[in-house]
Each structure stands twice: as structure tokens, then as C-alpha cells.
């Protein structure tokens, strides 16, 4: 989607109906907390929702709880230049104490032109201990006329003391239909068949699906599967093919971890297929024409070993091991 997708109001976003009801109830009662924690999977719209909520809070049209999209405040939100909206994002993978201190200093002043200043702290699960302790002081004694919206990945740990001082709003994966509709609004709009494949493989995360689309990850994945599914390929006899494929994977750089997640989905589907179980993600679309019929017949032991090999590769990347070497070892183990 664009910066605000179908509009600049959170009520116009696709999915997350439970989150909408919780926020609208707060609007209706006039009892907004001093801090929200939007917690859910990566790429399902938490930050986009937060921006839409900020726009709605400061909209000059008070006839409805959403944002009108046309008043002075909404136009500033749309252009990304609203003086009473702050965004704090991780720097080099973490929110640092200097960022929190600067935020606290800004909160000591009243909003410039709105009733409420909104601060969005993205990915607070990346926050270092000293930064988290500094934030706790603000959450314990929040300044008036300010709303903090924290976002966190549900698979990552957040300090219980932070959670207890926020109203938690759960976010969930979107339906395949909603994910396809969101992909249709992307500049790189995929064809319907590709959109449904992306929606299935992203497991309802439009952000992840968009990443797959922009990086042409599906095409790379098909090449990798074509190599590892080739029954004639022998790592001892044809190492050059595996090494060249590893180079292609390593070129994904910071997008290599989500690529490995995609590879795990395919291996998991192969495992479910081998067990004759129906609950699969539909990754058969990753197979090149003819691959399904000539693919290697893998035992359950081999499929489990493959999943373990990908898990090891993920851990090695997290330790900043050489990407190309990690990919080479992985492919030789698959």
C-alpha cells in the first residue's frame, strides 16, 4: 500500500477488526490511555494503523471518530509533515537510550498545534535495557496531552514492566483475500495467480508479501528449489551449481532471513505432503514446471534434517557469519 493505503484513517484499513473495535470503544468513551502497545506478527499493519490513529486523533472534523483526510491536520499527516507526530525507529537494529532521552525532552513541551501529540515507537522489542528503563519512567508518569503508541513483534520478548503500563491491542495475520487486495494496490501489482501465491506464502502478512514482490524473492526461490529438487545433482560431482546458487541467495543481503523463512515454508509443505496431511500453505506454486514430477523423493528424516539445516543457517546469520558461506553450507546440507 501507499503511506496510508486506502486512506489516512485506521478505520479504512483492511483487516484487524478487533483492534478497530478496541480503539473505537476508547474514542466513544473518551477514555484513551496514555500508551498503547500494538503487538502482533511482523508486516500486518501495526505501524500503518498507528499513523491512522494519530491522524484521527488530530483531525479537525469532529463529526466522526476517523480522519476526514482533507482538513489542515490530515493534509499534514498525508504529507508526513505534522509537527505533533513523532516516529522513533530502531537505529542499526535497536532503539537506543539517546533516542528515548530526546523523545522525553520533546514531551516536556506542549503540542505545537494539536490537542494531542502522538509518538510512535516502532519495534520496541529491539530496545536495549537502558533505553527501556528510561522509557519506563515516562510510562509511569506520562506527560499530559501526549499519547505513546508502541509496536512490537509478537514473536519477540517485551519487558513485562512495559507491557503492564500500556493498553495492549492484539494484531493478527490477515486473510488471504485481504492480503491479495492490498497487493493489488502496490505499484508492482502482481497478476492474480502470483498475488494469491504471495498471500499464501506470506501467511497473511502483507508487509512480508510486499517484500517478496519487491525483491523478486519468489523467482529466486524457484531457482533454488529447482536446484535442490534435481535428482541428477550430486554435490560431490557438481559443486559449481550449488556454489553459484549460494551466491544468488547471498545477494539478498539483509533480506536473506525472510528468504530462509520462505524455504522453511516449502520444506514444511513437503513434510506435510509426505505425511499425507492436508494443512499446507500451498507452496506448490514455487515448483518450476516439471519439478514436481521429477523432484527428489525425500524421507521424513531428510525433510526434518533440512528444516534443522535452515534453523542453523538462521542462527549463523544472527551471529553475523559470512552470508555466502552460510548459504553454501546450507545448500550442501539440503
Model-predicted regions and their roles:
Residues 1-55, 73-76, 144-145, 154-262, ...:
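Charged, glycine-rich active-site and insertion segments that engage polyanionic ligands
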Residues 108, 133-150:
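Conserved catalytic/switch belt of AAA+ P-loop NTPases
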Residues 122-128, 133-140, 156:
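Catalytic acidic motif of RecA-like/P-loop NTPases
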Amino acid at each position: 500500500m501507499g503511506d496510508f493505503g486506502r486512506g489516512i484513517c485506521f478505520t479504512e484499513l483492511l483487516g484487524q477488526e478487533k483492534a478497530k473495535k478496541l480503539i473505537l470503544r476508547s474514542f466513544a468513551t473518551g477514555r484513551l490511555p496514555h500508551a498503547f502497545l500494538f503487538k502482533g506478527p511482523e508486516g500486518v499493519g501495526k505501524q500503518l494503523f498507528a499513523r491512522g490513529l494519530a491522524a484521527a486523533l488530530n483531525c479537525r472534523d469532529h463529526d466522526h471518530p476517523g480522519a476526514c483526510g482533507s482538513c489542515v491536520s490530515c493534509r499534514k499527516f498525508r504529507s508526513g509533515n505534522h509537527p505533533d507526530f513523532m516516529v522513533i525507529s530502531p537505529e542499526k537494529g535497536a532503539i537506543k537510550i539517546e533516542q528515548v532521552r530526546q523523545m522525553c525532552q520533546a514531551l516536556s513541551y506542549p503540542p505545537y498545534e494539536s490537542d494531542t501529540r502522538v509518538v510512535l515507537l516502532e519495534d520496541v522489542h529491539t530496545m536495549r535495557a537502558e533505553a527501556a528503563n528510561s522509557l519506563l519512567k515516562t510510562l509511569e508518569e506520562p506527560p499530559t496531552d501526549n499519547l505513546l503508541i508502541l509496536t512490537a513483534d509478537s514473536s519477540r520478548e517485551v519487558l513485562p514492566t512495559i507491557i503492564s503500563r500500556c493498553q495492549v491491542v492484539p494484531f493478527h495475520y490477515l486473510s488471504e483475500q485481504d492480503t491479495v487486495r492490498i497487493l493489488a494496490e502496490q505499484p508492482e501489482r502482481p497478476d492474480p495467480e502470483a498475488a494469491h501465491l504471495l498471500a499464501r506464502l506470506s501467511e497473511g502478512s502483507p508487509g512480508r508479501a510486499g517484500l517478496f514482490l519487491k525483491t523478486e524473492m519468489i523467482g529466486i526461490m524457484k531457482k533454488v528449489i529447482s536446484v535442490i529438487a534435481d535428482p541428477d545433482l550430486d554435490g560431490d560431482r557438481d559443486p559449481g551449481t550449488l556454489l553459484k546458487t549460494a551466491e544468488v541467495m547471498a545477494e539478498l543481503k539483509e533480506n536473506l532471513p525472510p528468504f530462509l523463512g520462505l524455504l522453511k515454508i516449502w520444506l514444511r509443505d513437503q513434510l506435510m505432503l509426505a505425511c499425507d496431511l492436508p494443512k499446507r500453505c500451498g507452496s506448490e506454486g514455487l515448483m518450476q514446471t516439471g519439478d514436481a514430477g521429477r523432484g527428489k523423493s525425500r524421507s521424513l528424516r531428510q525433510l526434518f534434517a533440512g528444516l534443522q539445516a535452515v534453523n542453523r543457517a538462521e542462527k549463523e546469520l544472527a551471529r553475523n557469519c559470512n552470508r555466502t558461506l552460510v548459504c553454501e553450507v546450507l545448500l550442501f546440507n539440503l
